[in-house]
């Protein structure tokens, strides 16, 4: 059973500092989607079955110079649109993918491909869902071996 409370119930109606500022709390939730290939190349996604790092990589997913943009994986896109519909979102008809530039060791290209919102203004159990996106998963930094695995 899931119990929910309003802010008033949780604070016993006390006039708190948070209440006087009309605080809203947001969560960013990342959910891996199961597809046969990565979102922006044809590399397989069976990396959970592979123990060796960096065997499921190519010039496209590592962002090598001269590589042209690759279309988004339709299987992954369909999964995320289905999720947005389940969350009662309005679905955007056009899909735009942008590059968010970061200087992290788990992003060999120096950018992460992420969509503009695919779904907006949804709700689940009276909890507002602002927007739903799809984005590529960066590599996984392994602290034990001091290496990055780009199989993801």
Give the location of each predicted region.
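Basic, nucleic-acid-interacting segments
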Residues: 2-152
């Amino acid at each position: 059973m899931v119990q929910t409370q309003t802010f008033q119930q949780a604070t016993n109606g006390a006039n708190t500092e948070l209440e006087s500022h009309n605080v809203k709390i947001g969560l960013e939730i990342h959910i891996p989607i199961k597809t046969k290939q990565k979102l922006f190349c044809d590399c397989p996604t069976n990396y959970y079955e592979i123990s060796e790092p960096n065997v499921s990589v190519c010039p496209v997913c590592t962002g090598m110079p001269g590589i042209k943009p690759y279309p988004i994986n339709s299987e992954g896109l369909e999964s995320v649109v289905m999720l947005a519909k389940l969350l009662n979102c309005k679905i955007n008809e056009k899909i735009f993918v942008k590059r968010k530039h970061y200087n992290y060791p788990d992003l060999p290209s120096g950018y992460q491909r992420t969509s503009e919102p695919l779904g907006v203004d949804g709700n689940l159990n009276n909890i507002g869902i602002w927007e739903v996106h799809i984005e590529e998963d960066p590599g996984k930094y392994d602290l034990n071996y001091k290496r990055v695995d780009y199989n993801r």
